[in-house]
């Protein structure tokens, strides 16, 4: 756990907790699950369900569609300099899909460990943003089109909760008329494990949430809306 000493005045100072614990919880929890599945380890239903708490925050928005919250899956992404390399590996794997091939998901897990969640891959990860997909184009989409201010709220029973504040960028090849690597990347990262369907990628715009602030809302003495130092 990292702390930063902030000088308040000539006579006193305070210690502020950094956002490191959020990323350990959100990224490492997902990583441990992926690595365990790749290793063929048994994971209880209870543990699997809890692991999704770091994957499925509420996306909060406000705009023409009113005040809204929607549960969406999120994922961390490679740094910009690693996007093309990672996407190329994902697409090669997706192109190999055969409905009769029972090894597709396992091979996808191996790629996720290699490029995202393995210990050697950590320096490749961009911890300034998270990505998601829009599958409905309803309230969230309408609001973020007009107002990019966004909050992502995470909760894991019974006590853990984190809040991210920032700006939501909508990335849509149908709007831009050009290749959008983040839209392809986020769709591919979803389909690298699940049954792929590249024909609907154009219908699924990407959200790129740029993190500006991190809060610990956990029901602990260090939580209850405590702002964490970010970046740290």
Regions found by a protein language model. Give the residues of each.
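Binding-site signature for planar aromatic cofactors or substrates
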Residues: 2-232
